[in-house]
Amino acid sequence: GPGLGQTAWSEQMIQRVFWEAEKRDVPVIMDADALNLLTQLKLSSKLPKNLILTPHPGEAARLLNTNISNVESDRFGSAAKLQKKFNATVVLKGSGSIVCYKGNGGQKWGLCNSGNPGMATGGMGDVLTGIIAGILAQGLSLKDAAEAGVDLHSKAADLASLETGEVGLTPSDVISELRSLLRYD
């Protein structure tokens, strides 16, 4: 998603990714432009079975054909609607990021209590997507990778903001703090 664009080439690329993901039984994480394409192309019938969506409230509103204030006024309900509509694990980013997934007995939720307003800047979602992808590559489930990724991302942002402050927090600051959270010394 990050940097994908929204062209005819992008549409072909995303359809190819879906096809390859199903053929190889590998997960797909969709963010940014990929989510916008998902809204425009009505691809929900062709989605891979191992899917994580990481929308911010604006992207969630487009995916649900509603407005941002409706998403923000019922974040749990919005995450649940996205999970059901796309049969995906959903990370609804924002203050109190929510992970919604299909578990035994129905939908389940995780709520992140870490993070700060400095995370509302370009590139932070790209970092989150990369963290989740790295965790998935280690063999964790979609739910576990999404929850661990959100937790690491927000805790790293909190650590970085102690040093730099929330204003001007950059994705690079967050990446630097990830190292300290992942050390096993």
Name the predicted role of every residue range.
Residues G1-S114:
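Glycine-rich phosphate/dinucleotide-binding loop and adjoining beta-alpha-beta core of small-molecule
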Residues L43-S44, P48, N104-Q107, M119, ...:
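N-terminal loops that bind phosphate or other acidic moieties
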Residues E59, S78, G130-I131, A156:
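A general alpha-helix detector
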Residues R62, T121-L152:
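Short, small-residue alpha-helix embedded
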Residues L63-L64, C112-M119, T129, A133, ...:
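Short beta-alpha connecting loops at secondary-structure transitions
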Residues I68-R75, G139-E147, G165-L169:
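Short, charged, surface-exposed loops that flank catalytic or proteolytic processing sites
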Residues K155-D185:
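Charged C-terminal helix
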